[in-house]
Amino acid sequence: MGRGSVTSLAPGFRFHPTDEELVRYYLKRKICNKPFKFDAISVTDVYKSEPWDLPDKSRLKSRDLEWYFFSMLDKKYRNGSKTNRATEMGYWKTTGKDREILNGSKVVGMKKTLVYHKGRAPRGERTNWVMHEYRLVDQDLDKTGVHQDAFVLCRIFQKSGSGPKNGEQYGAPFVEEEWEEEDDMTFVPDQEDLGSEDHVYVHMDDIDQKSENFVVYDAIPIPLNFIHGESSNNVETNYSDSINYIQQTGNYMDSGGYFEQPAESYEKDQKPIIRDRDGSLQNEGIGCGVQDKHSETLQSSDNIFGTDTSCYNDFPVESNYLIGEAFLDPNSNLLENDGLYLETNDLSSTQQDGFDFEDYLTFFDETFDPSQLMGNEDVFFDQEELFQEVETKELEKEETSRSKHVVEEKEKDEASCSKQVDADATEFEPDYKYPLLKKASHMLGAIPAPLANASEFPTKDAAIRLHAAQSSGSVHVTAGMITISDSNMGWSYGKNENLDLILSLGLVQGNTAPEKSGNSSAWAMLIFMCFWVLLLSVSFKVSILVSSR
């Protein structure tokens, strides 16, 4: 058996599917006439060949001791159900019952075990050749009219001896001579060969080499105050010098060691240069609404370059500052060259209109009212509303002062009239003279007074509801009588009067004692009875002992 077939497998690779895979995949696809990804099972008439002749008919070229075949069933009678399994030199005899092949709880096939016997039945000689015959069971195919008995799958192997050989391996033993390296084997190319054929890697020498498309220009000097990140649109750049060296080519330029963009993309990114009537270049405004001495000639009737009220010295002005607050100019705090780092010359330079830190510290003084900043959606306060608020406050003060004078005059009139009234009538003076008495009377009026007659007591049901509404504590507060007399009080009128103050206060013990006393008395009676029973039993015992002697 050679290894020239395309289906030969390397050592360690074996065709060893499970029973379910043989039925659900291989046998079903064969019956439905569908192709296989790996054609490892050949079609032959197993029941017309001897078992020792079948290994040569296998599609898998290996020395394994098991083989797989598709075979058609040969009926013994045309109209019968029995199968003819007789060969020229023997026959295949069924042993045991058919076993079900399950896919979960569903039956997908049947498995039959057969043993080859030499000779004729029933006197044939049993051999070690065994066959497992797999048959498909699919209800869906029955509904479509597919004949499932057209093919069966046979697994044939030879045992090492008589009797059951459970767990026996049927793989071929390894022979090293069969797998020696041959001259016609294909080798994988090395990494060096891959690198020489495919130019995938870039060396450092390739980067140093300059292409012919690169032109070096060293005529443009680099300014002393050059900062990385500055564009050619800076106001301080001399356009008349730099524009003479801009070449209209598609190549890259190297100006002093700095690679720049091509001319096409450079023209797209470059902003237009404004010239006046004399031909001189105009500086480009970086802010909004910049006015220059030469820009007056470019203004039209629409004043397209007019100064915007929302900008101040090329910077947008925040519109949420207060009137009268110091406005800070951003240009006064910036460096001259608009650099992002600090130079030694900047430390020595002094600014005339710099920000005073003391003004910042004294900003939140006592006169500052933060409420003015809240509650108004307008950016600027309306001066007329402020004046109206001041006038309304003054009018309110005048009205309050007038009302005070009217009240004082009224009190004086009432005081003069009270002199002519009897001494008993002084107790019924208005409450606003004595705020303390007014509060005390309200507080004492909320306390319920004790009931005078028995008829005023609530009924039994009302009392139960009243006690249920109260708290479950053992102490309750009821009304009592406390009288304070002969207390002289000095009023603003210079009179000495007697003041009677009545307070109601009292403590009542909760009604928990009867329940406790009732429970304790019951326990006492029970203990007393037990004691007497014990005493009588002891005396009875003693009397029995004495009488026995």
Curated annotation (Swiss-Prot):
Pfam families: NAM. GO terms for molecular function: DNA-binding transcription factor activity; transcription cis-regulatory region binding. Keywords: Activator, DNA-binding, Endoplasmic reticulum, Membrane, Nucleus, Repressor, Stress response, Transcription, Transcription regulation, Transmembrane, Transmembrane helix. Induction: By abscisic acid (ABA). Induced by heat shock. Induced by cold, drought stress and methyl methanesulfonate (MMS) treatment. Residues 9-159 form the NAC domain. It is a single-pass membrane protein. Residues 395-418 are annotated as: Disordered. Disruption phenotype: Delayed leaf senescence and enhanced drought resistance. Enhanced heat resistance. One of its GO terms (cellular component) is cytoplasm. It comes from the Eukaryota. Residues 395-416 have a biased composition (Basic and acidic residues). Residues 108-165 bind DNA. Expressed in roots, rosette leaves, cauline leaves, shoot apex and stems. GO terms for biological process: drought recovery; leaf senescence; positive regulation of DNA-templated transcription; regulation of reactive oxygen species metabolic process. The chain crosses the membrane at residues 526-546. The keyword Transcription regulation applies. It is found in: Endoplasmic reticulum membrane; Nucleus. Transcriptional activator activated by proteolytic cleavage through regulated intramembrane proteolysis (RIP). Promotes reactive oxygen species (ROS) production during drought-induced leaf senescence. In response to abscisic acid (ABA)-mediated drought stress signals, binds directly to the promoters of RBOHC and RBOHE genes, encoding ROS biosynthetic enzymes, resulting in ROS accumulation and triggering leaf senescence via programmed cell death (PCD). ROS-induced leaf senescence sustains plant survival under drought conditions. Involved in heat stress response. This is NAC domain-containing protein 53. It comes from Arabidopsis thaliana (Mouse-ear cress). The gene is NAC053.
